[in-house]
Amino acid sequence: ELISLLISQRAPKRALLLGPTYSEYARELNLVGGTLEYYNLKEEQDFRLDISDLTDTLKSDIDLLIICNPNNPTSSAISTADMKKLLTVCRSLGIFVMIDETYIEFAPEGTSLSAVSLVPEFDNFMVIRGVSKFFAAPGLRFGYGLTSNQAFLQTLLTHQNPWSLNSIGAYAGERMLKDTDYIQKTWSLIDSERTRMCTELSGLDTVKIYPAYANFVLVKILKEGLTSFDVFEKAIHQNLMIRDCSSFESLNGEYVRFCIMNPEDNDRLLDVFRSL
């Protein structure tokens, strides 16, 4: 809801997305009727953003820049320091930035990725977050946003659905954010299993993996004649669901994405990749 509300109220004539990324951004942008363009992250750079190249590309006729950090499906991320550089350039060009940090809680220890600390310094962006991923509670529809742009915040409040969050969702969301035991256990599991999975997969010559900062890993299929759908089907036959990424902007039929699971299911998925 917050993504839709933000985009509808910014109503950009020209928006820029860092691709490949979550398809709902494009859907909401198409509903408001503006022009949508992609700045595609480069595979040869492991889908990491080249800040200098992007800032050289930005022009003042762009109204809205949308960033998912860490990004879905690449699991790549932008550091807080680089985000500050980007926001500085965007502010000088009059570009508003939406930063979706839905997966930020999964980031490895010691990485500085969140833009929340930049909120007091810049009024040309909004950070949005939710509980659907880290807390495995998509049905609550509980999310929140942070911005220092008081005028835009008032616009959002004016146009927000008055019944967007019920009392049960509000109570559950508050309890979740205070559940430090769950937070630590979940983060530790994801962090250790992500490291293990990436280490194991990096030793296979049939796939290529990319540095991962979220709870999922992007994999490129290197074996000739094997498509992402083929790998998807192999996983399904083992009762494992992975994502065929061929529907993402700029990704062809060579990529799949999998989420970090419990160790036993991760072992079964490793067997699928080893069998390629």
Q: Residue locations for each model-derived region?
A:
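Conserved beta-loop-alpha segment that forms the PLP phosphate-binding cup at the N-terminus of a helix
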Residues: 1-13, 143
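Active-site phosphate-binding strand-loop segment of PLP-dependent enzymes
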Residues: 37, 44-108
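Helix C-cap/helix->beta junction micro-motif
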Residues: 32, 92-93, 122, 238
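Conserved PLP-anchoring active-site segment centered on the Schiff-base-forming lysine
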Residues: 9-28
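PLP-dependent enzyme catalytic core of the Aspartate aminotransferase-like
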Residues: 81, 237-240, 247-276
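PLP-dependent aminotransferase class I/II
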Residues: 24, 124-210
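Conserved PLP-binding catalytic core of the aspartate aminotransferase-like
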Residues: 191, 204-238
